């Protein structure tokens, strides 16, 4: 887990072996996605002399707040791509701004270490809205055609952006920029609820249809009740 942070000293290899052995002694290992489970399986397989006893692996995803967050009408006018969260160094928002087509607006909600640097670019189709309260989440998520989710390359299996599931609840598709075959990459591609690379063409009608599929998926697969039932089955 230390590779994405750039740690290469021998002591971190020792720490990794200690943690891998601890994982191997568990009866049950829960993960948030398929990529995370893949990493856990390989960690356990690396530990010697445990072939007679393997932990059970179960995936339990984050849930979508489908009761509080409801689909709202899509804004008229230009296509709006929205990012809500930490405006930090590892989110890659500078690269997003580089790739942003002129006909698409990028709206940023939140604050962070890169905020002032990005503002200084004075890009005409990029707008900064600052932080927001959790009580405003429904309103914020509805203020776009498609929502941006990023995950740093090298973070495969080490994190699943939980914001994704409330985006689905809001009835908005996802533009995911991150490791291939990570959980959100698979989720988006398998269900047709967005893009995992910059689309060649932006179409409001297509985005709206993807958004309807996203909400339907949230209700059928990721409600609080469904996810809590998964926990009950392993307790």
Sequence positions of predicted segments:
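Membrane-proximal helix-turn-helix segments that form the acceptor-binding/catalytic region
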Residues: 9-29
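Carbohydrate-associated surface elements
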Residues: 35, 60-63
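Nucleotide-sugar donor-binding and catalytic loop/hinge architecture
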Residues: 51-54, 66-80
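Conserved donor-binding/catalytic core segment of Leloir-type glycosyltransferases
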Residues: 75-91, 96-101, 107
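Nucleotide-sugar-dependent
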Residues: 91, 133-142, 147-168, 173-186
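Nucleotide-activated donor-binding/catalytic signature segment of Leloir-type glycosyltransferases, i.e.
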Residues: 105-110, 115-138
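A charged, aromatic-enriched C-terminal amphipathic alpha-helix characteristic of glycosyltransferases
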Residues: 198-235
């Amino acid at each position: 887990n230390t590779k994405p942070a750039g740690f290469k000293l021998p002591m971190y290899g020792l720490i990794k072996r200690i943690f891998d052995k601890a994982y191997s002694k568990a009866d049950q290992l829960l993960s948030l996605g398929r990529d995370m489970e893949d990493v856990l399986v390989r960690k356990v397989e690396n530990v010697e002399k445990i072939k007679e006893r393997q932990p059970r692996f179960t995936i339990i995803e984050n849930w979508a707040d489908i009761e509080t967050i409801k689909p709202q009408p899509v804004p008229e006018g230009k296509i709006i791509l929205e990012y809500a969260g930490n405006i930090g160094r590892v989110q890659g928002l500078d690269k997003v701004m580089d790739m942003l087509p002129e006909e698409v607006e990028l709206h940023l909600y939140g604050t962070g270490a890169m905020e002032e640097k990005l503002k200084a670019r004075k890009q005409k189709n990029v707008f900064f809205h600052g932080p927001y309260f959790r009580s405003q989440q429904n309103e914020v998520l509805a203020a776009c055609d498609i929502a941006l989710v990023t995950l740093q390359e090298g973070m495969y299996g080490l994190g699943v952006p939980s914001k994704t599931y409330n985006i689905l609840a809001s009835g908005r598709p996802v533009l995911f920029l991150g490791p291939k075959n990570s959980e959100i990459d698979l989720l988006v591609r398998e269900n047709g609820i967005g893009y995992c690379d910059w689309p060649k063409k932006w179409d409001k009608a297509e985005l709206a249809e993807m958004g309807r599929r996203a909400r339907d998926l949230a209700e059928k697969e990721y409600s609080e009740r469904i996810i809590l039932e998964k926990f009950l089955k392993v307790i």
